[in-house]
């Protein structure tokens, strides 16, 4: 049957540092990196991540064997590349529960055996089944839990292990290793001398007898090359942050990964027209408005918020329609851009003459910004040395108005805003903090400002209501759901909501399926479902049962599902394209669900697009779905055959997001016959009809 809310994961990572490397079969190299498994040759450049089935993003080992390519994650998950060269199959997860790291680059293979050096043991794995054969924790007189393996190597029929106590060796019968009952006997290992498991020259790089002197091959006058592979007239030179190819006397730097270059992402913000902007802690921003990421742009003079971005859970990136962007760098004021952040417009700096509060001379602290309710500019809350924070209004032409000292706390956290119910005033929510910490005690201030459009562009004389925080803690993120008239928020340890006409924050009574977590971020989708990011447990989608804010049912998403990293620093929902974006230290994840799109204007007089059907002709089973798009969320969709018989109907949750996706099967679960089919979309008095062709 048709799949409701078709799901699709994408991961974007920076594939560095390189932890291990091995030559590919004909050309190129396989690389184990902190951003996934990378394949790089003269033409192609792919990074494989959990979205391709890996279930982990940080890999410490890779081997290329006659049985295929195998990758080993930081904590010992083992996966094999599928024959289609597209996805991966996880063979073994058993080691990950031990939470012991693999020694980077120390994964070897012989016959049908993979040998993995962990920090406290050596593991032997059956390559065919992926099952662990056994692990040894002592070799000779060396306890590996005390003197862990540093390097391993296979030379002929012997396995060598180097520790801080020297190198030991053991002769192995790799074909009959399962029957080697003495493998666990430490006495079968012997100390050896004169064996070098890493004999590269640390001072120079030599290819075909020629010493290469190119600067990219050296760091501090020492060779940056850790692996060297000669492949049919080409030599690949690889280091932790280096990929180069030497061919016909010419060295080519292949290090840069063009598709995604934003490292240390900590914040994402959906673009109203569709897409996302991401910010990094080292002061760069990058946008994706469709199928690719733009090159990162420096936010301000090379400054970044650095660890403050993580420590204080900064939410300082906001985006208006038509590409206007505001960003705050810790201590450095506000920075306005247009063209999705690629055209700097104006800097509002703390050492200039303006009304911003400062916590120190020439030093501003802002933890949150948001879009003004009428989309005329941005709002922010600035901390003040006097212990009374202020609220700022910044227009797109860089005018700033400050309501100084309107809060009672030293520090202000995230900020959110909406129009009052009579559409005259602004309601502004500011999370208060007794200290800068994301774990601080605090509450929530609710301000009612007259719209600046009625006050000559100035933010003046607010009414303030202060309420107790959830469990007395400061909120670290907030999301306004105007359709359902509720504000959702998270503290580091809790989830709460406050209805617009209430004066207190409440906890949902039941959140079935949600484990205790440290929360980092929150957003609400067009259906009123709540999404929360966590510090270590991935993302949860909390569905309201029977429309209740108090009864929620959780769906949990982790790296097993396709998330790049279970440590989620921020989330934001693109309601135009139906995508939730998630920020991680090693990249960005996106997750498409058809029900994440906002569809309330579809099939109305203000709709920007008419109902459409694609692809036509439609080939069922060809890894695609027939889509009937731009329909009302209250619509009913019926599909008929040429004889007028009803084949399928869609209603309710099946049309959430304004799109029906049909796999080409009838009510009986079988493929429909080739031919002409008709669709009818009914939404109140509006009816849209059309036809399409099915072919096999």
Give short role names for the model-derived ranges:
Residues 646-672, 684-688:
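Glycine-centered tight-turn motifs at strand-turn-strand junctions
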Residues 1-610, 646:
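Carboxylate-rich, polar loop motifs that coordinate divalent cations or form catalytic acidic clusters
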Residues 565, 620, 633, 656, ...:
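Surface-exposed loops/turns
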Residues 636-647, 677-679:
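Short, glycine-anchored, charge-dense loop/turn motifs used at functional sites
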Residues 604-639, 650-652, 659-662:
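Glycine-centered coil/turn sites that cap beta-strands in beta-rich domains
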Residues 389, 442, 624, 660, ...:
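Extracytoplasmic/periplasmic beta-strand context in beta-sandwich domains
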Residues 676-696:
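C-terminal tail/sorting-segment detector
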Residues 138, 257, 652-653, 677, ...:
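Residue-level structural signal for beta-strand termini and adjacent loop
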